[in-house]
């Protein structure tokens, strides 16, 4: 993972900075406890730009068991819900933070939403396959929605 410093919200305590750990190969971001909420709107745009600049990195699938970078204990898969949909994150039981795939982060921030059943059916009539946002593998949308 690479560390990147982005602007945080200024809560009257001076200019805040948020340091995120980003894995471009596995397309994931480690957020220390509640760090995802501390990003300023400009920092979210900066982060999307950074992710776009590294879009050609060779991708690695996520490991079956992810570990907290602070305590090395296993992360537990869980879901969060926002207006744009439900998305998966991997949490540390010790509340050190969470790991989020780039695609989940985009859902969290409202830039991406899940397709409705009617939209999936319409897309399945027009295309044979879509590609996994995690590993890039083709997915037959007529049968599956994820790899």
What are these regions (language model features)?
Residues 6-15, 35-43, 80-86, 104-108, ...:
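Short cysteine/histidine-rich zinc-coordinating motifs and their immediately flanking basic loops
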Residues 28-31, 36, 91, 97-105, ...:
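Short, structured motif recognition centered on aromatic/hydrophobic residues
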Residues 1, 30, 75, 98-99, ...:
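Cys/His-rich microdomains that often coordinate metals
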Residues 20, 28, 65, 89, ...:
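Residues immediately within or flanking Cys/His clusters that coordinate Zn2+
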Residues 13-17, 53-65, 82-86, 119-128, ...:
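Short, flexible, mixed-charge glycine/proline-rich loop motifs
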Residues 23-26, 68-71, 92, 132-135, ...:
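Short cysteine-rich clusters marking metal-coordination/redox-active sites
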Residues 2-10, 45-56, 72-79, 112-119, ...:
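Short Cys/His-rich Zn2+-coordinating modules
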Residues 94, 109-111, 122, 137, ...:
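Terminal recognition/anchoring or ligand-binding modules at protein termini
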């Amino acid at each position: 993972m690479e560390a990147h410093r982005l602007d945080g919200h200024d809560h009257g305590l001076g200019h805040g900075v948020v340091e995120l750990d980003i894995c471009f190969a596995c397309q994931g971001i480690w957020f220390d406890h509640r760090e995802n909420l501390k990003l300023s709107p400009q920092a979210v745009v900066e982060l999307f730009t950074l992710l776009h600049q590294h879009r050609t990195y060779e991708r690695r699938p996520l490991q079956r068991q992810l570990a907290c970078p602070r305590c090395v204990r296993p992360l537990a898969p869980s879901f969060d819900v926002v207006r744009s949909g439900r998305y998966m994150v991997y949490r540390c039981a010790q509340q050190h933070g969470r790991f989020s795939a780039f695609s989940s982060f985009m859902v969290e921030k409202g830039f991406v939403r899940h397709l409705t059943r009617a939209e999936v059916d319409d897309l399945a009539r027009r295309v044979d396959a879509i590609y996994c946002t995690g590993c890039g593998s083709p997915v037959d949308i007529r049968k599956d929605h994820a790899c």
